[in-house]
């Protein structure tokens, strides 16, 4: 076997960290780009040839015609939305790379979307903040062994099996939420039509990825959302329904963990969060409003304004531990230009005691107060910086403090949305 050259890129906060920008950057070097978790609830924007492209489930490598993009078995796939997304990208004039889809990936179906919306509405004041795209119910069905996988469509008795599950889901929606039924034949026809568009892409992607790595290919694993939204290690219950940490790259792809040799955690220079859940460093003032506007902190899918706060290193160190992060990449550093005083949370205060971890329960996390380190900001425009040495002293100190407290090397930072506004301080792929 040749030398392993693989890299996992994961978000190290609550999502929206700029993973798409980094996976797009590394996709220029990679031979294969793999999505290993999540569904089309995690939109990100890629700037390519002067155009902005919003992608949700398709790996970022699709914009490089020399790259093979893989949707792994850990993903939840809405085939109809996938086909629409591919058509939109094609119609913009982009020459697409090769796409492979795991035959073991779970399918998001129309009843999952209905259940997602009905469940969220029924929670009242205890809403989780789901995007209502059917992700949670899809993973619920997976665990309950009611899920339908891509490979199942080729089974001879698929229509009968699908109809049985469909009728069960309709009964559940009617009895629990009084939701009107949808038509089975139309749902089935739409699913088959979408499948026929992509069926040549369907394969055992685990075998493909394993062979690519063993043959010396550069393989990039693209995480979705963020480590703090992980179903096991995130800020439960305000999490997503899949494992978003880097440790799931092997399980969600179908390869050995021994074939992955580097993990990059992408983190904003500040913190953001969407929906409910504890946020000890949240800024509910003009400073936070300014960061939101300069950073364009609105959901790429939902357009919802994101909650904004100071950088939380307690949360970041939690992500580093649970994902085994080797390097950090800091995004949106330019957004902090002009902020006179910068605060970094290095520990929490819970019931008068200092702690350096995220409590397991949301009630205790809500009670945590942030303990801050104060650092002077910088006024200079850094959007044209090409090297670390060109940064203002205070910006250098800010990055160095993050690396010092987290005990993880920073491999680069971004000073704007364009691919060329990416500064690499250490090559890791």
UniProtKB/Swiss-Prot annotation:
It catalyses: IMP + L-aspartate + GTP = N(6)-(1,2-dicarboxyethyl)-AMP + GDP + phosphate + 2 H(+). InterPro entries: Adenylosuccin_syn_GTP-bd, Adenylosuccin_syn_Lys_AS, Adenylosuccinate_synth_dom1, Adenylosuccinate_synth_dom2, Adenylosuccinate_synth_dom3, Adenylosuccinate_synthetase, P-loop_NTPase. The gene is purA. GO terms for molecular function: adenylosuccinate synthase activity; GTP binding; magnesium ion binding. The active site is at 16 (proton acceptor), 44 (proton donor). Keywords: Cytoplasm, GTP-binding, Ligase, Magnesium, Metal-binding, Nucleotide-binding, Purine biosynthesis. This is Adenylosuccinate synthetase. Pfam families: Adenylsucc_synt. Pathway: Purine metabolism; AMP biosynthesis via de novo pathway; AMP from IMP: step 1/2. Homodimer. Its cofactor is Mg(2+). Plays an important role in the de novo pathway of purine nucleotide biosynthesis. Catalyzes the first committed step in the biosynthesis of AMP from IMP. It is an enzyme of class 6 (ligase). HAMAP family: Adenylosucc_synth. Belongs to the adenylosuccinate synthetase family. GO terms for biological process: 'de novo' AMP biosynthetic process; IMP metabolic process. Mg(2+) binds at residues 16, 43. SMART domains: Adenylsucc_synt (SM00788). Transmembrane segments: none annotated. It is found in: Cytoplasm. Its EC number is 6.3.4.4. Substrate binds at residues 300-306. One of its GO terms (cellular component) is cytoplasm.
């Amino acid at each position: 076997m040749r030398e392993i050259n693989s890299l996992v890129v994961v978000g190290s906060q609550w999502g929206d960290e700029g993973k798409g920008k980094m996976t797009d950057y590394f996709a220029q070097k990679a031979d294969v780009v793999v999505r290993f978790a999540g569904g089309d609830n995690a939109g990100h924007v890629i700037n390519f040839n002067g155009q902005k492209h919003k992608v949700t489930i398709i790996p970022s490598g699709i914009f490089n015609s020399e790259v093979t993009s893989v949707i792994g078995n850990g993903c939840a796939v809405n085939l109809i939305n996938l086909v629409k997304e591919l058509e939109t990208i094609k119609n913009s004039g982009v020459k697409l790379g090769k796409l492979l889809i795991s035959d073991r990936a779970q399918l998001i179906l129309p009843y999952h979307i209905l259940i997602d919306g009905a469940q969220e509405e029924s929670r009242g004041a205890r809403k989780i903040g789901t995007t209502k795209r059917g992700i949670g119910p899809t993973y619920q069905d997976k665990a309950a062994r009611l899920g339908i996988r891509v490979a199942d469509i080729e089974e001879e008795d698929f229509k009968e099996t699908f109809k049985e599950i469909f009728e069960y889901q309709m009964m559940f929606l009617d009895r629990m939420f009084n939701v009107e039924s949808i038509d089975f034949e139309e749902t089935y026809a739409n699913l088959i039509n979408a499948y026929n568009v992509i069926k040549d892409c369907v394969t055992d992607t685990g075998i493909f990825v394993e062979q690519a790595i063993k043959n010396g290919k550069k393989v990039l694993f693209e995480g979705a959302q963020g480590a703090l939204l992980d179903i096991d290690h995130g800020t439960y219950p305000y999490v997503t329904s899949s494992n978003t940490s880097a440790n799931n790259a092997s399980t969600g792809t179908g390869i050995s963990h021994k074939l992955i040799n580097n993990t990059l955690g992408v983190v904003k220079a500040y913190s953001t969060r969407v929906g409910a859940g504890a946020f000890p460093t949240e800024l509910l003032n003009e400073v936070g409003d300014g960061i939101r506007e300069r950073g364009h902190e609105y959901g790429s899918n939902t357009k919802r304004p994101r909650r904004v706060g100071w950088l939380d290193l307690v949360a970041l160190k939690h992500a580093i531990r649970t994902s085994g992060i080797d390097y950090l990449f800091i995004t949106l550093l330019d957004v902090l230009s002009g902020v006179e005083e910068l605060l970094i949370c290095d520990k929490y205060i819970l019931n008068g005691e200092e702690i350096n971890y995220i409590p397991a329960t949301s009630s205790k996390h809500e009670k945590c107060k942030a303990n801050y380190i104060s650092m002077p900001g910088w006024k200079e425009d850094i959007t044209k910086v090409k090297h670390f040495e060109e940064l203002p002293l205070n910006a250098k100190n800010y990055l160095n403090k993050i690396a010092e407290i987290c005990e993880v090397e920073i491999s680069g930072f971004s000073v704007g949305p364009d691919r060329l506004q990416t500064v690499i301080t250490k090559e890791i792929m």
